[in-house]
């Protein structure tokens, strides 16, 4: 993050490798924030950073082991760092850092390393024996778990996808499990079943391993909650405090009903200049469209640009009434449309480093219908 650098000296472009161009971004008007607001951003940013390993693990069962082994080789390498194999390993490691794993962040295809397997094996054997050895094929065999999200026709898309949301279950078993939950659950205001859990088969039984403070990913979530608690000392208003408390309760219980309550109150909080997203949100990384990848963003309002945007959102009903669609598809009453322009202060998880340029949440259809949504454009990334 770069802040307060003149237009004539600021260079948006950073390093380039393979098909990736890294870009820098500024934090305009950050100096105009109060010390208290900056402290709030700091605590929320720390909470964002501690979700990184969750995303790595979600994106592939072996991602964390591969990353940590690569990092150990990189740090302990004593040979010629200009040599082809080491340079190729360095580029591969950058791919892994960027994509939160060994699969392309957009295409979801497995990366093909350009360093030799013999080179890598020798370097692993030359360093600390406490490092976990990799199994054959996890890096070098393109046929082993070749795609993070595989929706190819005719395949069991759960078993053919390398993402780490399911353990030992088939596509049919996933469909049956969640169909039963939906059938037995409420017809109105239903939770987003499966959003925060790994579905696991043990023997003949199938259960959810819920992502919460005393469940899976508990070590990382405990640190996230620690910094959320620290952030409470610097909130801008009582509603922000309420929102943070609700998020903490959700992380402690893993109860999706609590997540919906949090989402509604997060949506209602409009007065503070600082806002954030922290949790299991988007389901694009799951071939079944159920499991939320962890993501985080800390933001503050771009006041001038928000003023312009809100002039449009205030007239949302007029735009709906005059939209060029069949009248039967127009909403008679437009609810809860808010539009802000924000500056991203910190990105994490599935939002980093390939970030969205805009966000519209919550995702639950019934919340959007009854309570509306928050729509933001990220001005310092566009």
Regions from the PLM with identified roles:
Residues 5-9, 14-40, 151-382:
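Fold-level signature of zinc-dependent metallopeptidase catalytic domains
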Residues 63-70, 86-96, 221-228, 244-252:
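Short amphipathic alpha-helical coiled-coil/interface segments
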Residues 2-85:
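Zn2+-dependent metallopeptidase catalytic domains
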Residues 81, 85-205:
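Auxiliary tRNA-acceptor-end handling modules of aminoacyl-tRNA synthetases
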């Amino acid at each position: 993050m770069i802040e307060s650098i003149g237009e004539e000296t600021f260079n948006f472009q950073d390093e380039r490798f393979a098909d990736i161009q890294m870009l820098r971004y500024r934090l305009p008007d950050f100096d105009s924030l109060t010390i208290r607001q900056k402290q709030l951003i700091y605590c929320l940013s720390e909470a964002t950073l501690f979700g990184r390993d969750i995303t790595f693990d979600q994106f592939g069962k072996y991602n964390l082991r591969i990353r940590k082994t690569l990092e150990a080789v990189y740090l302990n390498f004593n040979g010629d760092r200009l040599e082809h194999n080491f340079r190729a390993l360095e580029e591969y490691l950058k791919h892994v850092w960027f994509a939160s794993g060994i699969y392309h962040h957009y295409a979801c295809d497995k990366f093909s390393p350009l360093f030799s397997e013999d080179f890598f094996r020798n370097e692993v054997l030359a360093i600390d024996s406490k490092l976990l050895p990799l199994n054959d094929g996890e890096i070098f065999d393109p046929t082993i778990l070749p795609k993070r999200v595989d929706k190819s026709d005719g395949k069991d898309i759960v078993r053919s996808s390398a993402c780490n949301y399911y353990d030992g279950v088939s596509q049919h078993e996933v469909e049956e499990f969640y169909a039963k939950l939906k059938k037995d659950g409420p017809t109105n205001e239903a939770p987003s079943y499966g959003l925060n859990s790994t579905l696991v088969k043990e023997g003949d039984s199938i259960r959810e391993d819920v992502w919460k403070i005393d469940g899976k990913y508990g070590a990382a979530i405990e640190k996230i909650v620690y910094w959320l608690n620290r952030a409470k000392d610097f909130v801008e208003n009582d509603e922000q405090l309420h929102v943070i408390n609700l998020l903490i309760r959700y992380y402690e219980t893993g109860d999706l009903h609590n997540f919906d309550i949090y989402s509604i109150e997060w949506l209602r909080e409009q007065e503070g200049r600082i806002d954030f997203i922290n949790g299991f949100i988007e389901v694009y990384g799951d071939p079944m469209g159920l499991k939320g990848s962890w993501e985080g963003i800390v933001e503050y309002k771009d006041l001038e640009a928000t003023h312009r945007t809100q002039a449009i959102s205030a007239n949302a009903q007029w735009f709906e009434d005059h939209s060029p669609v069949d009248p039967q598809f127009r909403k008679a009453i437009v609810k809860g449309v808010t539009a802000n322009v924000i500056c991203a202060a910190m990105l994490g998880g599935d939002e980093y480093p390939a970030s969205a340029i805009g966000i519209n949440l919550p995702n639950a259809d019934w919340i959007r219908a009854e309570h509306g949504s928050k729509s933001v454009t990220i001005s310092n990334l566009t």
